[in-house]
């Protein structure tokens, strides 16, 4: 599954976007590695106060071209990350991803959930069905098995948001 995230990252068009991540391991790091392998630029939003704090927390540093620090905590980092994003892409994930998706709903950010990754991403779609969100969230779901479609949907959402 990590390889699938790396492949998705390698398919994103580096001349059309910058990838923002929470600068953590797992899917975000793999996607960033794939994106950078094609010359893409990755900005990591660290929950740490500085690089030493980031490394001490066990977070990777190899796949970010820039690292931003000093958000005042994890939740503040999540808000800053989502606020800066044009489109939110979720590959599985855990509590941090859930929080970022909820922030994206409140900020009316377009979201792309890639199904086929273990974690909260696909479950979030079911959760939204149970809620009465107004206005309704701008969310699209694509299957991870069709990486080209996932990338196309994400790139289209980013282009649409850019105007």
Task: Report the location of each language-model feature.
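Acidic/glycine-enriched connector segments
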Residues: 4-10, 16, 22-101
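Short, solvent-exposed amphipathic alpha-helical segments in soluble enzyme
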Residues: 5-8, 36-37, 105-107, 128-130, ...
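Hydrophobic residues within beta-strands of alpha/beta enzymes
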Residues: 19-20, 112
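Structural recognition of alpha->loop->beta junctions
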Residues: 40-41, 45-48, 55-72, 125-159
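C-terminal binding/interaction regions
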Residues: 70, 75-147
């Amino acid at each position: 599954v990590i390889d699938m995230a790396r492949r998705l990252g390698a398919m994103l068009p580096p001349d059309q976007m910058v990838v923002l991540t929470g600068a953590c391991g797992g899917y975000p790091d793999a996607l960033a590695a794939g994106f950078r392998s094609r010359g893409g630029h990755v900005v990591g939003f660290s929950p740490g106060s500085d690089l030493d704090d980031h490394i001490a927390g066990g977070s990777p540093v190899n796949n970010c071209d820039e690292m931003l620090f000093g958000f005042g905590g994890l939740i503040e980092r999540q808000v800053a990350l989502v606020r800066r994003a044009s489109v939110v892409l979720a590959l599985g994930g855990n509590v941090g991803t859930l929080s970022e998706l909820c922030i994206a709903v409140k900020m009316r950010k377009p979201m792309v959930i890639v199904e086929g990754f273990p974690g909260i991403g696909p479950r979030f779609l079911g959760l939204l069905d149970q809620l009465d969100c107004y206005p309704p969230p701008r969310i699209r779901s694509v299957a991870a098995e069709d990486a080209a479609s996932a990338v196309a949907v994400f790139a289209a959402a980013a282009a649409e948001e850019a105007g």
